[in-house]
Amino acid sequence: MSINQHEIEHVAKLARLTLRDDEKQLFTGQMEAILAYVETLNELNTDDIAPTSHAVPMENAFRPDCVAPSIGHDRALANAPDKNETYFRVPPVIE
């Protein structure tokens, strides 16, 4: 697979990167090398290899969910810069 400088510019724009002309040329060569390596990996026969999501066996390490005593609203909100009854008041994130 071949990659050109226009595609590098497109990827840079998506990543919100500003690249100099020499960087575009450098990254074009590097991306071509990476894609060539991936192509060689695609040639491997993986029919007898089971799909994996982790290299080592893993299990969830959840703790039991049980009710435990906690601090009350008054104590939790004692140092809050702004509150509304029993809730923290925070600045809006989305307008």
Swiss-Prot record:
Stated EC number for the protein is 6.3.5.-
Q: Note the Gene3D superfamilies from the entry.
A: Glu-tRNAGln amidotransferase C subunit, N-terminal domain
Q: Which reaction does it catalyse?
A: L-glutamyl-tRNA(Gln) + L-glutamine + ATP + H2O = L-glutaminyl-tRNA(Gln) + L-glutamate + ADP + phosphate + H(+); L-aspartyl-tRNA(Asn) + L-glutamine + ATP + H2O = L-asparaginyl-tRNA(Asn) + L-glutamate + ADP + phosphate + 2 H(+)
Listed GO biological process terms: glutaminyl-tRNAGln biosynthesis via transamidation; regulation of translational fidelity; translation
Top-level EC class: ligase
Q: Which GO terms describe its molecular function?
A: asparaginyl-tRNA synthase (glutamine-hydrolyzing) activity; ATP binding; glutaminyl-tRNA synthase (glutamine-hydrolyzing) activity
Task: State if Hydrolase is listed as a keyword.
Answer: no
Keywords in alphabetical order, please.
ATP-binding, Ligase, Nucleotide-binding, Protein biosynthesis
Q: Which superkingdom is the protein from?
A: Bacteria
UniProt xrefs under SUPFAM superfamilies: Glu-tRNAGln amidotransferase C subunit
Pfam families referenced in this protein's UniProt entry, alphabetically: GatC (PF02686)
Described purpose of this protein according to its UniProt entry: Allows the formation of correctly charged Asn-tRNA(Asn) or Gln-tRNA(Gln) through the transamidation of misacylated Asp-tRNA(Asn) or Glu-tRNA(Gln) in organisms which lack either or both of asparaginyl-tRNA or glutaminyl-tRNA synthetases. The reaction takes place in the presence of glutamine and ATP through an activated phospho-Asp-tRNA(Asn) or phospho-Glu-tRNA(Gln).
| PANTHER family membership | GLUTAMYL-TRNA(GLN) AMIDOTRANSFERASE SUBUNIT C, MITOCHONDRIAL
Assembly information from the UniProt record: Heterotrimer of A, B and C subunits.
Q: Please give the family membership noted in the entry.
A: Belongs to the GatC family.
Indicate what this protein is called per its UniProt record: Aspartyl/glutamyl-tRNA(Asn/Gln) amidotransferase subunit C
Origin species: Trichlorobacter lovleyi (strain ATCC BAA-1151 / DSM 17278 / SZ) (Geobacter lovleyi)
